[in-house]
A protein has these predicted regions:
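Residue-level recognition of the N-termini of beta-strands and the immediately preceding loop/turn
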Residues: 1-3, 45
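Active-site-proximal loop/turn and secondary-structure-junction residues that shape catalytic pockets
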Residues: 6-12, 51-55
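Generic secondary-structure boundary/loop-capping signal
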Residues: 6-7, 14, 102-107
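Long C-terminal interaction/binding lobes of large macromolecular proteins
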Residues: 11, 26-28, 33
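Generic structural "secondary-structure junction" signal
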Residues: 11-12, 19, 107-112
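Short helix/loop capping segments that flank catalytic or ligand/cofactor-binding pockets
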Residues: 14-15, 118
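Short secondary-structure boundary/capping segments
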Residues: 17-27, 61-68
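Radical SAM enzyme core and accessory elements
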Residues: 32-146
Length: 146
């Protein structure tokens, strides 16, 4: 028996993909549907898919700025209905925005201990399906953490 699990990319601060937008929910649903159709009838295959809507919410909460507190106020006052709270607030900017290298990121006020230049280079490698060399903490100080 083989299990395939697919989940949407949730770009998060402090990672090389912090500059990357989340893929549109509609597009993710179509892709997951195509995979289901292509592989769904294979014997001994189990598939699971992460929720694009949950990924959207996670992306907003991780990439949002101070205005996220308004979302939470709405969410807490409406019976914990995330869908209607998201609809009330303009959050697409935080979810679908492609940031550039020189853009100010809402989470830049937090000192993560690394240099953004290192993460940017790693992001560029990732876009090209490149690999990041193994870190030898005894000799390497590229990221700025060690």
């Amino acid at each position: 028996r083989v299990t395939i699990s697919l989940s949407p990319l949730v770009p998060k601060p402090g990672t090389p993909f912090q500059w990357h937008p989340m893929e549109e929910v509609k597009s993710l649903k179509k892709k997951f549907s195509r995979v289901r159709k292509a592989l769904g009838k294979l014997p001994h295959l189990k598939m699971s898919f992460g929720s694009p809507h949950e990924a959207y919410l996670q992306t907003y909460l991780s990439r949002g700025d101070r205005s996220v507190h308004e979302f939470f106020k709405t969410y807490l006052s409406n019976g914990h209905d995330a869908k209607s709270a998201l609809a009330k607030h303009s959050v697409d900017l935080f979810v679908y925005r492609q940031y550039g290298k020189e853009d100010y990121l809402p989470w830049d006020i937090v000192d993560h201990g690394y240099r953004n230049g290192f993460l940017w280079d790693d992001y560029q490698r990732g876009l090209m399906a490149g690999r990041t060399p193994v870190c030898d903490t005894a000799t390497c100080h590229v990221c700025g953490i060690c």
